[in-house]
Amino acid sequence: MICSIGAVSATDLNDNSTVEVTSSVDDSISVDEASIIDVGQNQEVASTSAATWDELKTACQSSGDKVITLTGQSYNANSQIVFGNSATIIGSSDTYITTNNPNLIPFFNSNSNLNITFLNVNFKDSNCKIFIQSAGNNELNNCIFSNITTGAGKTSVVYNTQGLMNLDNCTFTNCHTQYGTITNYGSNVRMNVDNCNFVNNTSSNIGGAICIDSKNTTVANCNFTNNLANLNQGNAIEVRAFGANITG
């Protein structure tokens, strides 16, 4: 089943809820690749490339802001990247990041002054605690997350903590989590989810696709297909904070 969410208030949303259908979508969902990103022309940013996970880790943790182009094919996240600069990571349809460590958070940022961007990055076939957990200002554009399982507790594929996170034109498919594929949690968090697709995702607890635990959340122009929360609390979206905006 496919539904487009439009003009609803803060409450639990299920894939089989009655909602205003604003547009129809095909069974096959494609994401156009973007080729241009504004990384801040008024600041000096070094460009580099990374062919392996270790090279990516070195670039992300070093001083000085970086634009990092992924030039390898498969990146095995066998350790944690703790961001040390405002990094922009640029992938392509030929590259992907994967991991098999249920206790690992491959990408982590607790510095509220950093700006982290993922552009055209594919994350797939993984078992981890959380894939991306970040404070600061975060942009995820044209990224694909597929076949990802997260660990026990309040875990998600993408977890926003004490910062601003914008997700645009991203796709989440066949992900199994505890707390939604995306979670916006905390008193000082803001999240905007626009033009994203959520297909065949499941949660052992709540929020099959998205768990909203902050009123500073906007979900717009997103499509939800066959998502499931085992506790039947928000098969598509679990809203736990009044004031969140969900529009078509």
List where the protein language model places each region:
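All-beta strand scaffolds that present successive hydrophobic residues in beta-strands
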Residues: 89-91, 113-120, 138-145, 165-168, ...
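Secretory targeting signatures
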Residues: 1-20
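Flexible, charged surface loops at secondary-structure boundaries
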Residues: 59-65, 69, 82-84, 109-112, ...
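Right-handed parallel beta-helix/beta-spiral solenoid domain characteristic of secreted/periplasmic
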Residues: 86-130, 141-149
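Serine/threonine-rich, low-complexity intrinsically disordered segments
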Residues: 50, 54, 71, 90, ...
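Acidic Gly/Asp/Thr-rich repetitive segments characteristic of extracellular carbohydrate-active
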Residues: 14-74
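Extracellular beta-strand/beta-solenoid scaffold signature
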Residues: 80, 101-109, 125-135, 149-162, ...
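N-terminal extracellular ligand-recognition/capping segment immediately after the signal peptide
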Residues: 51-54, 65-87, 94-95, 101, ...
